[in-house]
């Protein structure tokens, strides 16, 4: 069975069976995807995280299908209906749709019309009709008039019910209808009468009709959401006449009275049973595909957001702006610890501007502030301009930071545990400041669904969404690596091999014993075994470690290789890291062994060139157009700076400094065909856009991307 799985996965993913086998062995041994991708390239043949995850997913699907087959076989055996041919078909089938079609005639059912007819003894009459030789079926039906069967027509009706069920369970019949759906199905949506005003936001779908295969994921998810809210009636249908004709060609073999009875049963089978069954199947399939597309978009956006450029370890002032309630100001040290908080009121209706300036100046000097993070919510533009009009004694950079999800964090258990003595306003301002310092470390504390970069994220399969988002966060955290001495337990949770309990144990050990000076000390952490150490060590950094390799992505299992390189050059490891001239003298082929190949050696040398490098780029300052404050300030043709805030499969939403974001439709991203917006833009990218149209009633702004 395992070898069969390897063959099927290999055919699906175009990856060799050997690579698949080795990868599955590593996963079974408890290795994580980031660890395998980074430190086991020789074993897997250099597979990346996406390929490893695909292997894992395919293997899990096949396992689930194998369990389903076992259940089906047991059920049919219990009925005493298993035959060698049927067993062979089940054994050879690895398509879930075909498998369920095979099982359908044996599947336990509720009391159907066909079952009622069988109980009335009408199955022989149904068999007679299907032979289509009897010239006078009405007369033969009279023999069945007894008990609950009132007359010959009642008997024929029961027989037709049996035939209809047989037709609906026939594999070829189902495939005929399925083929028609796949080729020509049209999805139709209509507004529910009397719900027009309530459904106004779905007005694009009030009279909607489109081939299902051309319906985009965002259209499908919007339609299904409106249907769930009781605002739209939705159906999926092929050409009904063509389907019935094809079915009749299969089942109606005689142009006589029996043939007419069978034709009537076929029509009933299609309308009452087959069409609705296959429609449900295609509704589920199209929803699943739309979910996968929406999740893919969400994952891409989340990855870009998590890997946004950090300001780094600087002393930051965070401001959660507001008008009437004032601006909450916090001051943090370079490690993100809260030093001070207070309110200022520089805006209407309070207008304590002079006092606000004085307070800001004093806090900057008292806490040696190097940068200011302003939340991008209410009063953001006014607060940013207020700060930029001030003259500080030293140069202070002002950044506008997304507040999305900050309120969720400030009311969460994580925030309460971090700041039990402070209210939500302080916690929110701290989160804004920390997002500037290190977006990844702060955003992992927030449910990704609250960050605001998804597309219908509440409508998609929540289990699949959570799995994909968790994998994305894990991938990003391990790609960047974390400082073992400053990382929160929540950030450490995502490190390969750790999880919540070990992460908390590390934080507790750090609190009791002081900062880690060596990766080896991890083995003293309660419940840290050899396997967990192997999985996590390479992703944890210690900036002031005794061994400089402890602040790199070089795994401890490879330290001996670097030490040998240094020894061969007559220098220390620290000198080797410091000198490019020395590193250029290294011939990696000298260090090849049965367990260490060229991929690992290349990674080691790359890491020695830039030890502990951060894959995230440098942070950039951005300014909105000062003349645009509300949607009413916009006009067609206006060119504006903006920041890409969200990407969907139909375009990109751009923050232009007002309450409403503008949409750059897919067709307006470039002067050529674009199938994926991610080819052109990324989250947080600074862009220039042209206003195409403004709908103030619906609060919609259409933009065009201006190529640089």
Question: What is each stretch, according to the model?
Answer:
Residues 1-21, 28:
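Generic start-of-chain signal for non-secretory N-termini
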Residues 542-708:
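Single-stranded RNA-binding regions, centering on S1/OB-family and related RNA-binding modules
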Residues 5, 57, 64-81, 91, ...:
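Long, highly charged, low-complexity intrinsically disordered interaction regions
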Residues 39-41, 130, 239, 321, ...:
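Short, ordered loop/turn segments at secondary-structure junctions
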Residues 179-186, 319-323, 377-382, 401-408, ...:
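A glycine-rich phosphate-binding loop feature that marks nucleotide/adenosyl-phosphate handling sites
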Residues 75, 89, 99-102, 226-239, ...:
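Structured, non-catalytic alpha/beta "coupling" segments that mediate domain-domain communication
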Residues 51-54, 61, 65-75, 79-318, ...:
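Duplex nucleic acid-engaging cores and interfaces of nucleic-acid transaction enzymes
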């Amino acid at each position: 069975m395992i070898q069969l799985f390897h063959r099927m996965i290999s055919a699906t993913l175009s990856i060799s069976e050997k690579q698949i086998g080795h990868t599955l062995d590593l996963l079974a041994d408890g290795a994580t995807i980031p660890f395998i991708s980074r430190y086991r390239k020789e074993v897997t043949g250099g597979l990346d995280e996406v390929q490893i995850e695909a292997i894992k997913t395919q293997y899990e699907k096949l396992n689930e299908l194998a369990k389903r087959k076992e259940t089906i076989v047991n059920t049919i055996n219990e009925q005493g209906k298993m035959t060698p041919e049927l067993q062979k078909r089940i054994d050879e089938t690895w398509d879930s749709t075909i498998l369920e079609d095979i099982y359908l005639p044996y599947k336990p059912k509720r009391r159907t019309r066909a079952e009622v007819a069988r109980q009335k003894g009408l199955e022989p009459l149904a068999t007679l009709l299907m032979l289509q030789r009897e010239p006078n079926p009405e007369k033969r039906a009279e023999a069945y008039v007894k008990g609950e069967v009132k007359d010959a027509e009642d008997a024929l009706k029961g027989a037709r019910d049996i035939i209809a069920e047989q037709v609906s369970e026939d594999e070829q019949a189902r495939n005929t209808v399925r083929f028609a759906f796949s080729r020509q199905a049209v999805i139709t949506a209509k507004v529910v009468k009397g719900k027009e005003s309530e459904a106004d936001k779905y007005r694009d779908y009030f009279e909607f009709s489109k081939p299902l295969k051309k319906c985009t994921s965002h259209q499908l998810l919007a339609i299904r959401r409106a249907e769930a809210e009781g605002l739209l009636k939705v159906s999926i249908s092929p050409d009904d006449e063509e389907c019935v004709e094809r079915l009749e060609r299969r089942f109606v073999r005689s142009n006589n009275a029996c043939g007419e009875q069978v034709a009537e049963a076929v029509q009933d089978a299609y309308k009452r049973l087959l069409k609705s069954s296959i429609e449900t199947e295609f509704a589920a399939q199209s929803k699943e595909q739309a979910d996968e597309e929406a999740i893919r978009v969400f994952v891409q956006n989340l990855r870009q957001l998590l890997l946004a450029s950090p300001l780094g370890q600087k002393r930051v002032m965070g401001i959660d702006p507001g008008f009437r309630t004032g601006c909450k100001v916090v001051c943090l040290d370079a490690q993100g610890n809260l030093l001070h908080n207070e309110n200022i009121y520089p805006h209407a209706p309070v207008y304590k501007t002079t006092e606000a300036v004085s307070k800001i100046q004093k806090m900057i000097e008292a806490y040696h502030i190097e940068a200011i993070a302003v939340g991008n919510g209410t009063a953001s533009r006014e607060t940013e301009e207020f700060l930029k009009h001030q003259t500080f004694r030293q140069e202070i950079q002002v950044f506008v930071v997304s507040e999305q999800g900050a309120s969720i964090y400030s009311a969460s258990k994580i925030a309460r545990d971090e700041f039990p003595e402070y209210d939500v306003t302080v916690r929110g301002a701290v989160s804004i400041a920390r997002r500037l310092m290190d977006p990844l470390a702060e955003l992992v504390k927030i449910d990704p669904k609250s960050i605001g970069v998804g597309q219908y994220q509440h409508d998609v399969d929540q289990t699949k969404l959570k799995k994909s988002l968790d994998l994305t966060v894990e991938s990003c955290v391990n790609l960047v690596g974390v400082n073992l001495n400053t990382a929160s337990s929540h950030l450490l949770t995502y490190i390969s091999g750790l999880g919540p309990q070990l992460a908390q144990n590390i934080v507790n050990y750090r609190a009791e014993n002081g900062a880690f000076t060596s990766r080896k000390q991890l083995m003293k952490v309660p419940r840290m075994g050899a396997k967990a150490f192997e999985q996590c060590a390479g992703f944890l950094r210690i900036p002031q470690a005794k061994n400089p390799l402890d602040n790199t992505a070089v795994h401890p299992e490879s330290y001996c290789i670097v030490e040998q390189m240094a020894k061969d050059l007559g220098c220390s490891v620290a000198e080797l890291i410091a000198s490019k001239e020395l590193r250029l003298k290294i011939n990696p082929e000298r260090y090849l062994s049965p367990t260490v190949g060229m991929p690992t050696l290349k990674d080691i040398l790359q890491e020695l060139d830039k030890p502990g490098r951060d894959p995230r780029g440098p942070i950039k300052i951005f300014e909105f157009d000062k003349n645009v404050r509300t949607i009413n300030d916009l006009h067609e043709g206006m060119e504006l700076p903006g920041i890409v805030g969200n990407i969907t499969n139909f375009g990109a939403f751009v923050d232009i400094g007002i309450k409403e974001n503008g949409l750059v439709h897919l067709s307006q991203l470039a002067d050529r065909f674009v199938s994926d917006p991610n080819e052109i833009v990324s989250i947080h990218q600074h862009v220039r856009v042209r206003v195409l149209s403004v709908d103030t009633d619906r609060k919609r702004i259409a933009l065009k991307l201006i190529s640089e």
